[in-house]
Amino acid sequence: MEYRVTEILTFAEPDLLNERQSWLATLAGERRLADNTVEAYERDTRQFLRFLTGYIGRPAAIRDIADLRPVDLRAFLANRRKEGAGARSLGRHLAGLRSLLHHLQKKGLVNAAGATAMRAPKQPKSLPKPLTDRQALKITTAEAQLNEEPWIAARNAAVLSLLYGCGLRISEALGLTPADFPPGTRSLRITGKGNKTRIVPLLAVVTEAVDTYRKLCPYALAADEPMFLGARGGKLQPAIIQREMQKLRGAFGLPENATPHALRHSFATHLLAGGGDLRTIQELLGHASLSTTQVYTGVDTARLLEIYDNAHPRA
């Protein structure tokens, strides 16, 4: 992905703009971060530079970044908190700024030791919000897709089936190529966060959904290029699937938590409820730490308590 940033030209000097552009290109290229992550870091650092310009009273330059102290970063985070940013967003802001500072330090332009030592805001533990199995099954069929051309309906159903049937992140699903689906394959090799590779089983119903899309797609699908295409033949963007889910929420009366990522949560929660063990689910999701996967035990317990409260005569 290439980033051409023009919006902040009025509140950052060219030396800083050029280095920021180089940093973003490194994130997208060499480090292979997901598009969504790079876009978030671009937005976060843009907000920071706008804040810094107001803070120092002139367009920010590299020399100003070199002079940053933890108190300056705390002032920025406090400003963002006043604007309504939550702990998770503040943590991402700080992670992006640290990454930019490390980039500048590697080039010998700043000494980032002081600023990067600042601790991230404490993150509240929140439970994932899965759909019910009935809701998940309903929205992963081509028939559920609304007022779409047949090939687009098949495409949406295939993508959503991969999220729920394989537990993929949306960026992982949209990065798949026809070469990932050789004839007769029963599994997918997925490269996820941190370039960690995992193998996930491929359910027959998911294979069928993908095959239907490939047959109906009006564009030629190159073996090593992204398989899921937009209406004009370019790579399908996550925002399209997110908008589709928004339409499905309205059409089927689904809760606000019915998002593409909720299908991945549903995959894990339903496996756990069906007797799957945490270690296996950890591998299927590509979590580096078991503690990340253990949050789903809380989801399952919460669902059990909800059923108990609604059904038990003494509740």
Swiss-Prot record:
GO terms for molecular function: DNA binding; tyrosine-based site-specific recombinase activity. It comes from the Bacteria. It comes from Agrobacterium fabrum (strain C58 / ATCC 33970). One of its GO terms (biological process) is cell division. Keywords: Cell cycle, Cell division, Chromosome partition, Cytoplasm, DNA integration, DNA recombination, DNA-binding. It is found in: Cytoplasm. InterPro entries: CB, DNA_brk_join_enz, Integrase-like_cat_sf, Integrase_catalytic, Integrase_recombinase_N, Integrase_SAM-like_N, Tyrosine_recombinase_XerC/XerD, Tyrosine_recombinase_XerCD. GO terms for cellular component: cytoplasm. This is Tyrosine recombinase XerC. Residues 14-105 form the Core-binding (CB) domain. Belongs to the 'phage' integrase family. XerC subfamily. The active site is at 169, 193, 261, 264, 287, 296 (o-(3'-phospho-dna)-tyrosine intermediate). Site-specific tyrosine recombinase, which acts by catalyzing the cutting and rejoining of the recombining DNA molecules. The XerC-XerD complex is essential to convert dimers of the bacterial chromosome into monomers to permit their segregation at cell division. It also contributes to the segregational stability of plasmids. Forms a cyclic heterotetrameric complex composed of two molecules of XerC and two molecules of XerD. The keyword DNA-binding applies. Residues 126-309 form the Tyr recombinase domain.
